[in-house]
Curated annotation (Swiss-Prot):
Region called Disordered, residue ranges: 136-159
Native source species: Pelotomaculum thermopropionicum (strain DSM 13744 / JCM 10971 / SI)
Alphabetical UniProt keywords: Cytoplasm, Protein biosynthesis
Subcellular location: Cytoplasm
Molecular function as annotated in GO: ribosomal large subunit binding
Domain of life: Bacteria
Main subcellular location: cytoplasm
Function as written in the Swiss-Prot or TrEMBL entry: Responsible for the release of ribosomes from messenger RNA at the termination of protein biosynthesis. May increase the efficiency of translation by recycling ribosomes from one round of translation to another.
Record's protein name: Ribosome-recycling factor
Pfam families assigned: RRF
Gene (UniProt): frr
Length: 185
């Protein structure tokens, strides 16, 4: 029973790491990546639809994204959605494709991004700690109900703590990698 709770906690912690990775990938660090457009939603026949479901997104150069819609009629809508997004990128359209030149990051924008990624990392750490707390509470209630001994409880809590430490360390590692990426001129 304790093993199942620990496996569930680890699974939830892995999901938290994936969320943090996605959050970091969607932040512009001066380099073009299709993940930048993951959160951009286009009003497609009245339905909010992600850009990557309406177009092919390619990276021909380090600072250039090319968005090639499969349906040319949706091109103006994609352009509008990119303008409305908080990416700080102005789309240039030639009627067939949209080109997004990724500008060099300013010092202010870098500082802003640093704050954002630190906040996202802290949210990830808090989520992992909450998973630890919930798992420990479930373990304690099992011990109270007589389903496990105090030694088993202590062993299980130590295992949950090791998982917590490991995944928080992983978030810290992701954070430092992203910080280096942002500070790279």
């Amino acid at each position: 029973m304790a093993g199942e709770l620990i496996k569930e906690a680890e699974s939830n912690m892995k999901k938290t790491i994936e969320v943090v990775k996605k959050e970091f990938a969607s932040l512009r660090a001066g380099r073009a990546t299709p993940a930048l457009l993951d959160k951009v939603m286009v009003n497609y026949y009245g339905t909010p639809t992600p850009v990557n479901q309406l177009a092919n997104i390619s990276v021909p150069e380090a600072r250039l994204l090319v968005v090639q819609p499969w349906d040319k009629t949706v091109l103006p809508e994609i352009e509008r959605a990119i303008l409305k997004s908080d990416l700080g990128i102005t789309p240039a359209s030639d009627g067939n494709v949209i080109r997004l030149a990724i500008p060099q990051l300013t010092q202010e924008r870098r500082a802003e991004l640093m704050k954002v990624i630190k906040k996202k990392a802290e949210e990830g750490r808090v989520a992992i700690r909450n998973i630890r707390r919930d798992t420990n509470e479930q373990l304690k209630s099992q011990q109270k109900d007589g389903k496990m001994s105090e030694d088993e409880l202590k062993r299980s809590q130590d295992e949950v703590q090791k998982l917590t430490d490991r995944y928080i360390k992983e978030i810290d590692s992701l954070l430092s990698t992203k910080e280096q990426e942002i500070m790279q001129v």
